[in-house]
């Protein structure tokens, strides 16, 4: 229809050609056209108009045509739509239309209209709609019942018509049989033979399925037989026999249970003929009575049947000859046949509800097989028996209540203690699945219920009325002496204070400054064969003072030295008596609080005292001899052998590697070692990636068992290609990428190593390494740093770009770009760009930034005191542009070093790429 509003009058005018004055559809053709218009209807007005037209139509042909064309399906669609939109008026109109249509069961099965209407009758909110839907449901139920009952009746009629001939012959047969007493017809004989043969099989099913077929005729025959048996045994009050008869009748009933209504005329017509022809009467009433008796006795099939068999077996033998004689006698009893008619009718009323037991049929067959000849006599007393049977059956059906004393029954169960059962235990998978489904449903319901719950109180708070209680009659504890005892006790003890905060927030954080633990060195003489106890340090600064009483801190250099000496074995000095390191430290430190740690490095005999501490521990090897080479023996750390070379041979490395040749100054001289860089300050295990080996450019394991990354190659070996960015000078933690120098450096004691971005540097012992980007510089034994100028190492050397400067042990090196500076041991060097510096350990660099020398990432040996760097102290000044931190001295933006925070020190110390609070950046807040 159009999109605008619809006028129903205009719509009716358009449909005027199909409708008469009352709005009823005129013809079958008109309803099909109206249906096509209904399919296009979208507005509620037009739909209601069409529904009213259908309501006005009275012709069943037109309505049936509407249903056949598809109107019922269309109404189903409209019903579904209006139900989803909850359109009550349209729903009522559709229900009225459905009630008006002549629907059948087949129509109701086509779609879910019936289901929707039933839902509306139960769950609709509108009461009128509910009533209307319930009325429609009841009407449809009546249609279903009537059609379901008429359909089998129609089928039976068809069958009966087909079998009418066979059915009509059986009543005629008894007439001919009784009169002529000759059973010449083949059909009856066959029927008798069949029960005999079928007795062994299960004929009950056959009879139950084929109602009114050939097996019916034997059912008539057994009826007679049962009747004859009753004649003989009725006086003896043989109750099971009537039951048997019922079973036989059940077979008859099985034959024709569906056509119950049709049986009544069959029963009545024979009754009318009974008066005229007496012999016809018995078989017909027996059919009806037998069927009713079977129905009455249906609920008690099993036990009674057995009893019947017991009683029947002796009596059945007698009647068989008796019946053979009295085949003509049924006429005597037939006058009573009119009597059974009324009971049969009464029973017919009971018939519809009672089911026919198929179980009894086989026994029927047994009785029939036992006495086929006795059938004629049985019908005689059948009329009387059925009444008794029905009475007995009714007695059995009566409801009896127990006596008062038996109304209650008590059952006692003794619980065995050992038979406790876990009720909550899941027995099988199905039960577990049920429990899970229930739990899921419960969770879903609670979630749905609480989804919009804001946990706000809906009920306003009402202050309760104050309770006015009378004063207590007894004061609790008035006569107690315990309160005085408690009061006396509290006078002499501290008061217990429980400070409850006003809010439940976390307490204010207490200020906590981690204090580094004091380092108490072990007695050197006693630690000969003992592995020292290594204490894990708490987070904090570097090590504390060596003496337990002193509060002053050792400089990091000395603290690391002490740790390294404690880690290794301490053999006695060459004189046989161990040197007391504690005394040397106290002599260096002086009074505990007199000097800061920087000033300690400026003492004139500082280097000598350091040598005294290091020599007995083998950290510098044995003392010098005539030709400047140490003797063999366990001089190196960890007991490594030094093989004495010839006068012109190279100095062997500490692990058996070949040492480099002597530096420019000459033979290896003693001097303090470079600072240790970690928990194991001197030696790395094999393959330590951070100290030697491939990660830092070390040349890999060498001839010795534990090749150390710092002494990777001998002084004479060519350096490997420089790895990018970082390396280690002598295996220490080298600078980061901005420094641009690194690579495997010279060993501290062994052969001169190299730094690919700096050139191989000289080792501490000997070997002339060089740093190609710095110029040749002497290690402790000699070396050079090409880009810095020839500078003296600890044993001598030079750094070309920095000017010649003296090493610790001797040799006058200089650093041309920095100015002359004095080495520690001798030889006043100069640094041209920095100004004159004085020789000895107190050379200074006027233009350098003040600070501790140990912070230099390139890390020249910290004991190679360079004197004053500006206002700084000797050996401790920052080299402003020559070294210092990679990041301008402040590493606070880097992650905090966890080793430093956990242990108090870090193996990489100043060369560590992470943030050490208070060392390479501001302390933590």
From Swiss-Prot:
Modified residues (Phosphoserine): 313, 382, 545, 591
UniProt feature, compositional bias: Low complexity: 325-336, 679-693
Compartment(s) where it occurs, according to its Swiss-Prot or TrEMBL record: Nucleus; Chromosome
Stretches with biased composition (Gly residues): 540-551, 656-665, 728-766, 775-829
Motif PP1-binding motif: positions: 394-423
GO terms of biological process kind: negative regulation of transcription elongation by RNA polymerase II; positive regulation of termination of RNA polymerase II transcription, poly(A)-coupled; positive regulation of transcription elongation by RNA polymerase II; RNA polymerase II promoter clearance
A single GO molecular function term of this UniProt record: RNA binding
PROSITE patterns to which the protein is assigned, alphabetical: TFIIS_N, ZF_C3H1
Zinc finger (C3H1-type): 891-919
Ranges where the record places region Disordered: 147-211, 304-398, 536-555, 587-890
Alphabetically ordered keywords of this record: Chromosome, DNA-binding, Isopeptide bond, Metal-binding, Methylation, Nucleus, Phosphoprotein, RNA-binding, Ubl conjugation, Zinc, Zinc-finger
Location in chain, cross-link Glycyl lysine isopeptide (Lys-Gly) (interchain with G-Cter in SUMO2): 179, 262
Interaction with WDR82, as annotated region: 418-619
CDD domains membership: TFIIS_I
The protein's role, per its UniProt record: Substrate-recognition component of the PNUTS-PP1 protein phosphatase complex, a protein phosphatase 1 (PP1) complex that promotes RNA polymerase II transcription pause-release, allowing transcription elongation. Promoter-proximal pausing by RNA polymerase II is a transcription halt following transcription initiation but prior to elongation, which acts as a checkpoint to control that transcripts are favorably configured for transcriptional elongation.
Subunit structure: Component of the PNUTS-PP1 complex (also named PTW/PP1 complex), composed of PPP1R10/PNUTS, TOX4, WDR82, and PPP1CA (or PPP1CB or PPP1CC).
Entry remark concerning the domains of this protein: The TFIIS N-terminal domain specifically recognizes disordered sequences in protein substrates that are then dephosphorylated by PPP1CA (or PPP1CB or PPP1CC).
Protein name according to UniProt: Serine/threonine-protein phosphatase 1 regulatory subunit 10
Annotated gene: PPP1R10
